[in-house]
Regions:
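Phosphate-coordinating catalytic segments in nucleotide- and nucleic-acid-processing enzymes
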Residues: 48-264, 268, 336-356, 361-364
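Switch/communication elements of ASCE P-loop NTPase nucleotide-binding domains
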Residues: 1-56, 238-364
Length: 364
């Protein structure tokens, strides 16, 4: 599990250290303080792939839907200063460290443009690059480059990394994959199709999912794929099955999150703006589910990070973690902008009720 992170020169983080992560981590703070950016920084190193280049492009190409080009590349660096390299260092619970450094390498074309000289044809064909250096316990695992260029508009296209050799990553084993669920997950049905297939191919998982859907709405009896690979739900007193699109954002968000826990072998799950689309009455249900998934994880090392800007969600969280006796494994990290720096403030789950009574500002 992730114990701590230090982020330098990444997006709005000039230099921020956050220590003491636990099993359930809630990230709060004001607008544009970096809650989502924190999840992305963690995902670069503890993500879907062992390869940070792949994790970063997953964020830009598939989650943010703003492919990594010159403008979006600049926004990755604090203050748009591409001369300073990005560094993200994560400490795991076994005291191992993962250290990622990202450096911008301007193409000759870019250098010529900045000098206001007309570039040659050869220079215009050379893309700028991001150089990735990954270290584990201060030992360099690999050094790779990612070209900053348009990606073809074709389904299933994957970026190719210049020097990627899977054998280099053996030193990162055992690798524990992660899942990131974006704030607009209700509109990303395509991202849960794979998870749903795995669940619906397993009778026991299918039964569990149907029970969880029935807890959300007791009129829902089951979910399945039709012959056109669309998700359809069987609803009480309605003859024909209804498409998932006929339901509200709350059910879609709930299904996306629950299916990620059930289907993936991920040990780290990041959920951005967890309350989006959910009625307050279903926030409690979702939190109970999340804590049950953490408690029932056979290896005991499932870790969850959630961002929220909802006071109501935090109040419900306080109720659920006390009900589930999970307060000592819950922390709230409030990010606050202080001049150039983002400063974290830690609040402990067992003291949330006390913070409320004293009208503590848990949102920066």
């Amino acid at each position: 599990m992730i114990q701590s992170v230090r982020i330098k020169n990444f997006k709005n983080f000039k230099d921020t250290q956050i220590d003491g992560f636990t099993k359930l981590n809630i990230i709060t703070g004001g607008n544009n303080v970096g809650k989502s950016n924190l999840l992305e920084a963690l995902y670069c190193l503890v993500g879907k792939s062992m390869h940070p280049c792949a994790n970063l492009t997953e964020i830009y190409d598939n989650i943010r839907k703003e492919p990594l080009k010159t403008e979006s590349k600049n926004l990755m660096f604090y203050g748009l200063d591409t001369k300073e390299e990005i560094q993200i260092v994560i400490t795991l619970d076994n005291n191992q460290t993962l250290d990622l450094q990202i450096k911008f390498i301007a193409s000759e074309d870019q250098k010529v443009i900045e000098s206001q000289i007309i570039p040659t044809a050869e220079q215009t064909q050379m893309p700028s690059q991001l150089n990735f250096t990954l270290k584990k316990n201060n030992e360099e695992i690999y050094n790779d480059h990612l070209n900053i260029a348009e990606i073809p508009n074709q389904l299933g296209y994957k970026r190719q990394f210049k020097n990627f050799d899977p054998n280099q990553l053996q030193k990162l084993l055992p690798f524990e994959s992660a899942v990131i669920i974006p704030s607009d997950a209700a509109y990303r049905q395509v991202y849960m199709i794979q998870a749903m297939r795995k669940i619906l191919d397993d009778n026991q998982l299918e039964k569990e999912l149907n029970e969880r859907l029935n807890q959300f709405d007791n009129n829902i009896q089951s979910i399945s794929f039709n012959t056109n690979n669309q998700l359809k739900l069987k609803v009480k007193n309605i003859k024909e099955k209804l498409p998932l699109s006929a339901f509200g954002d709350g059910l879609k968000k709930y299904l996306h999150i629950v299916s990620a826990f059930m289907a993936d072998n991920a040990k780290t799950i990041y959920i951005d703006e967890v309350e989006n689309g959910l009625h307050f009455s279903r926030m409690k249900l979702l939190l109970r589910c999340v804590i049950d998934f953490i408690n029932n994880n056979k290896d005991g090392n499932l870790q969850v990070f959630m961002t929220t800007h909802s006071q109501e969600f935090i109040e419900i969280l306080d109720q659920v973690i006390r009900e589930k006796d999970f307060a000592h494994q819950t922390k709230l990290f409030c990010l606050k902008q202080d001049d150039q720096y983002v400063i974290p403030r830690t609040y402990y789950g067992e003291n949330l009720e006390y913070y409320f009574e004293n009208e503590e500002n848990l949102f920066g």
